[in-house]
Amino acid sequence: PRSLVMMGGPIDSRESPTAVNNLATQKPLWWFEQNVIHTVPANYPGRGRQVYPGFLQHLGFIAMNPERHVMSHWDFYQDLVKGDLDDADAHRRFYDEYNAVLDMPAEYYLDTIRVVFQEHLLPRGLWDVAGERVTPGAIRETALMTIEGELDDIAGVGQTRAAHRLCTGIPEANRVHLTAQGAGHYGIFSG
């Protein structure tokens, strides 16, 4: 059958709330608009657009686990000193990708904060897209797999698995869930 794989997504962000969830629920939407939305400067492509800048997203990622990143860079330095170029190259590859964060359109970011984290419209059965109600229970002939990271500090354990609760039309035989032990949010996507 057709299949749908959901990985590390906050389908129901009320399950196992993380620091990300708490920030989104403790601040009103206007706070995000005033504090994290910026205009792309004139000398950059996309000038004049309102965005949630990639550098702020990156700063947020680093701020969630500063000790881990400091230790990772210390280990990288030690690998270079020891001549362990394989581990040093693995560090470089990881951070080349981890640091590649793009600006997000303001409309998308703010709508995500409101719909997913503040109003929980999908799990409450109240999300409309283009004037039509989204009804996950209507999915019948598509297999569903959900994947979560045991240590995910962005989409907590249970937030993605919640898709199974919403997709009531999918037979049990066409459902599977995997919790990747020892994996965080980035880890479930990077292996």
Predicted regions and their residues:
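Short, conserved loop/helix-junction motifs that constitute active-site signature segments
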Residues: 136-141, 167-172
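C-terminal structured domain segments across diverse proteins
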Residues: 113-114
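Conserved alpha/beta-hydrolase "acid-adjacent" motif
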Residues: 153-162
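Catalytic histidine-centered segment of alpha/beta-hydrolase-like enzymes
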Residues: 154, 177-191
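Glycine-rich phosphate/ribose-binding loops and adjacent secondary-structure elements
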Residues: 1, 148-149, 164
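Active-site nucleophile elbow and catalytic-triad environment of alpha/beta-hydrolase enzymes
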Residues: 117-136
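Alpha/beta-hydrolase-fold enzymes
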Residues: 2-107
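Short beta-strand/loop motif that positions the catalytic acidic residue
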Residues: 139-141, 145-148, 152
